[in-house]
Amino acid sequence: MMGKATRDAYGEALKELGAVNPDIVVLDADLSASTKTQVFAKAYPDRFFDTGIAEGNMMGVAAGLAAAGKIPFASTFAVFGAGRAYEQIRNSICYPKLNVKVAVTHSGLTVGEDGATHQMLEDITLMRALPNMTVVVPADAAETKAVIKWAADYYGPVYIRMGRAKCDDICPEDYTFNPGVSYEAVSGNDVTIIACGIMVAKAVKAAEFLKEKGISARVINMSSIKPIDEKAILKAAEETGAILTCEEHTVKGGLGGAVAEVLCLHKPVPMAMIGTEDTFGESGTADDLLEKYGLTAEHIAEEAETLIARK
């Protein structure tokens, strides 16, 4: 069932947490209407700081607030957060292990018509390489709220990757997030599809297509990219013998890379990755772009069948 965009759930979660924790502060870089931090800003204007189009400075301010005992959520589009402010995230937040939550929206191809300059497809790779950084890609609104709640209680840097478009509901409303723990959305024993973000819903749909052909596909929501759920990956490799990863992100160093690192060291099995290749995005509708770059349930099902043949 189609639910809210993860960015909408983010705004709601901030407002709810702001009511119970006066140490939570929110920063934005002139995009609060889009990131939905304006929901928090209207409720708690004295705890909201718009730094303007100066993302690096925003991260520095967030680091200072964290050093003073606050719990800052620094928000902007993924391309500006992970891209423009990378040095400040690395040196001012991760190096001293400060309690800053970098919460970005408008990630991946589903930014749509804004085109390649705004379609961040490399941020998971960049962020999971940073020491002390936890990287999370929630699949839906319920999981987003659970992740924000967890992040507010956890001490340390966290990168939370959210999207622009509405997405299907996957997790139950009472879902509890734990880092390094995945969620099995569909059980199966012929092949495992490991996905994150909006691709989880597409993987679930692909599993339905495969079921019609008598193929039992397991679907794992791997929202915690770092730390990753090694146990679930190795269990899936042992029980299904084939792993397919799906992400709205480059296959170079993202979810697919993280899963491959686990498999090659501990349990090599046939594996394939679905995501963008060595390319930028382009302008177009979200649906058209997902179709062009192979990020559809139909393509996932096709790749799963090809992968099974390699077992």
Q: What name fits each language-model region?
A:
Residues 1-161, 166, ...:
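Thiamine diphosphate
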